[in-house]
Amino acid sequence: MAVEHVEWARVAWVDTDAGGRIHFTAAFRWAEMAEVGLRRKLGLIEGWGDYPRRRVEAEFLKVLRFEDEIEVRIRPERLGETSITWTFEITRDDEVCVRGALVVVRVDVDGVPAPLTKKERAALAG
């Protein structure tokens, strides 16, 4: 899939642990920030629906610290019937520091998995 999106951020104090390194949860917040940015860019914010996380994973390759400037790149890797697998990379100075994936499942108001919409599928497939 050719669709991807990039967001830029700076590691905030709140993103760090007592040792001054990023807390592991920060990577998932930044990935979600990029996910929302991509949805916004593709016109998929209105009527977005509910997408709980089914699986999250991250590999931390380099240390990120307070005030580091980062780039967060996300792309849909796989579109299932009811799910999207996002892959993301977080870089500093063109060096990959974190890479990971999120599997999200579209659910209806009762929390039951629901098919992706045709609009979503077309936009995310590129």
Segments predicted by a language model, with ranges:
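HotDog/MaoC-like acyl-thioester-processing domains
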Residues: 3-7, 60, 64-66, 77-126
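Hot-dog-fold acyl-thioester-processing enzymes
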Residues: 1-55, 108-126
